[in-house]
Regions:
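Acidic, low-complexity intrinsically disordered segments
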Residues: 1-8, 12-15
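A structural motif corresponding to the C-terminal lobe/cap of the Radical SAM core domain
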Residues: 9, 31, 35-182
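Glycine-rich, aromatic-lined ligand/substrate-binding cores of catalytic
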Residues: 18
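Catalytic histidine-centered segment of alpha/beta-hydrolase-like enzymes
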Residues: 28
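Glycine-rich Rossmann NAD(P)(H)-binding loop
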Residues: 22-25
Length: 182
């Protein structure tokens, strides 16, 4: 109800014409919640872009969302090496499953981009090229690559500090013009 009121307010008062739902957990909702969102969003009647992870996508949710305005998706793929992705990022999905899931949006006319990260602690050149290779098998409309940022409070930040790649007092930024890690 609050989400509906806020979306309606921005559409009517600020003349918003497009929404972007920036949350990796957007599709973590159950079927009942998804159906309620779709019913509510029908009234908002604006195109939208959402962020999610490949493992959350299925025909049912993309079909429903495309009917109420889903225009584009950003997928957090992050890394192309299965073992590295599982060990370092705790994401235990097979590349073949990612490739298959990312065929679904095209069935419903939904464009998508994939987001990748490079420069992780312990990542090698070969591992980085595994990400490129995975992306060659995904028919994304756009592929992005970002530099790893060791944010405070994350397990990877702790790992970077333990490996003496960054000092504990260093404040990191999302956008930078120089390397963050030693």
């Amino acid at each position: 109800d609050l989400v509906y009121k806020e979306l309606k307010y921005f559409k009517e008062i600020h003349k918003v014409e497009y929404n972007y739902f920036w949350a990796d957990t957007f599709l973590a909702m159950n079927k009942k919640e998804l159906d309620a969102f779709c019913e509510m969003y029908k009234e908002i009647n604006l195109p939208f872009w959402m962020q999610t992870r490949p493992e959350t996508v299925n025909d049912d949710n993309i079909s429903k969302l495309s009917k109420v305005g889903l225009h584009r998706i950003s997928f957090g793929v992050e890394h192309g090496n299965e073992e590295f992705r599982a060990k370092i990022l705790d994401r235990r999905w097979k590349n073949k499953d990612i490739i298959e899931r990312l065929k679904i949006p095209h069935k419903y006319g939904v464009a998508f981009s994939v987001n990748n990260i490079t420069g992780f602690p312990t990542e090698t050149k070969k591992l980085a090229f595994d990400t490129i290779e995975l992306n060659r098998h995904i028919e994304a409309d756009n592929a992005n690559i970002y530099s790893f940022v060791p944010f405070h409070g994350t397990p990877l930040r702790k790992m970077c500090e333990e490996l003496d790649l960054i000092k504990p007092e260093t404040i990191t930024k999302c956008l930078t013009n120089k390397p963050i890690l030693n």
